[in-house]
Regions:
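N-terminal subdomain of nucleotide-sugar transferases
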Residues: 1-47
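Active-site proximal beta-strand in glycosyltransferases
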Residues: 122-128, 138-157, 173-175
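Conserved donor-binding/catalytic core segment of Leloir-type glycosyltransferases
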Residues: 4, 201-221, 227
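Short hydrophobic beta-strand element within catalytic cores of glycosyltransferases
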Residues: 281-290
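A charged, aromatic-enriched C-terminal amphipathic alpha-helix characteristic of glycosyltransferases
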Residues: 325-356
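Short N-terminal targeting/anchoring amphipathic segment
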Residues: 2-7, 96-100, 113-132
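Donor nucleotide-sugar binding/catalytic pocket of nucleotide-sugar-dependent glycosyltransferases
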Residues: 149, 156-157, 167-201
Length: 362
């Protein structure tokens, strides 16, 4: 079987792992991305297209522009609907996407021919996104009897919505975000895959304790409050604080490895619970703090996280610092849990269960 992943970019390295998982199962797998990996993960087929809205300047421009249509919260405004459905916000928005598709068309069609992209058996559309806004590629392969999977990661479904033509032909919908389970009538949960064996468990704590935070989006993570609280503890001589941002992935990992406590997020603005940042820190055996609402706690009742929010973060940090054995206990529990839930072998087995259940494979 030949499997193709189509994605805006290789954001957190999972495309490499999916390729590895499928090849271990005896299948051929490739992935094609619109833009280069921002954190220098390896790319397979990269189109290097224009209009990369994952870049900060363009993302901010889009956010400010969408305030015209959505109000103060701009692009971050969650769309309503079950599922939410993408439509252009207005005439300017519509004209832009027409122009973008025209600009992309020649390079995309050349790549379809050069890499024989019409002759795969299974197609994963990461972020539920085709090359084109009308999902013409997905419709073409569906007519050829191909199987289509859409995997949603957060913002794509919360603030953009499903692409209606692609959603209509999808055989299987997946997400690794618990809140998205309530935003689509036909979607399944899958833990993020990770090579949890990449790191040995941390044994020795720093003195003073080293606290890390590595936001990809400060607004989503509640970083302003996290940074303010940690800077206060630094000024009191209680901790060392490492803010890890805008670095190649390898360098960011090396910085995280030096930490004793990792803070993921303290709000639900950009998705609930935790993401790849926490998966990495748990795999390192690092005590990991994040906000888990009641729904998320019920979804993973055996979780290893220290549950925090803006009102209790400082006190919980002080408790851990004054009880360093608790830092180690949470770190060791986290390592065991992340192997069980996120090791790529276990996640791959679950994906193939969905494949069989939904008739993707016999």
């Amino acid at each position: 079987m030949k499997i193709l992943y189509i994605s805006p970019e290789n954001t957190v390295g999972t495309l490499n792992l999916w390729k590895h998982i499928h090849e271990k199962n005896g299948h051929n797998c490739r992935f094609i991305t619109f833009f280069p990996s921002p954190k220098k993960y390896g790319d397979d087929i990269c189109l290097n297209l224009p209009f990369d809205f994952t870049k900060k300047r363009l993302a901010n421009w889009r956010h400010q522009f969408y305030k015209i249509y959505r109000g103060r919260t701009g692009y971050y405004t969650e769309k309503k609907g079950y599922p939410p459905v993408w439509t252009p916000e207005g005439k300017i928005d519509k004209l832009f996407f027409i122009m973008k598709d025209v600009t992309w068309k020649r390079k995309v069609e050349k790549s379809i021919d050069n890499f024989d992209l019409l002759n795969f058996d299974v197609y994963h559309f990461e972020s539920g996104m085709d090359f084109f806004k009308d999902s013409s590629f997905a419709q073409k392969i569906k007519k050829r009897g191909k199987k289509i999977i859409c995997h949603y990661h957060g913002e794509d479904l919360r603030t953009r919505g499903v692409m209606p033509e692609l959603d209509a032909v999808s055989d299987l919908n997946l997400t690794s975000e618990v809140d998205l389970l309530g935003k689509h009538p036909n979607i399944n949960y899958l833990f993020l895959p990770f090579d949890t064996d990449s790191f040995t468990t941390k044994q020795k704590l720093n003195n003073p304790v080293r606290v890390c935070h590595a936001p990809t989006n400060r607004y989503y993570k509640g970083s302003a409050a996290i940074i303010a609280i940690c800077k206060k503890l630094v000024s009191d001589g209680i901790i060392v604080f490492d803010l890890i941002e805008n670095l190649p992935h390898k360098e960011a990992l090396n910085r995280k490895l030096e930490g004793d406590i990792f803070i993921d997020q303290i709000g639900d603005k950009g998705g609930w619970g935790y993401g790849m940042n926490s998966v990495e820190s748990l795999s390192m055996g690092i005590c990991t703090l994040t906000m888990l609402n009641e729904t998320y706690q019920n979804f993973i009742p055996d979780h290893p996280f220290v549950n925090v929010d803006e009102t209790n973060l400082e006190n919980k940090l002080l408790f851990l610092i004054n009880n360093p054995e608790q830092i180690k206990i949470h770190g060791n529990k986290g390592k065991e849990w992340v192997v069980q839930k996120h090791h790529y072998t276990n996640v791959g087995k679950k994906l193939y269960e969905y494949y069989q259940k939904d008739g993707i494979v016999n």
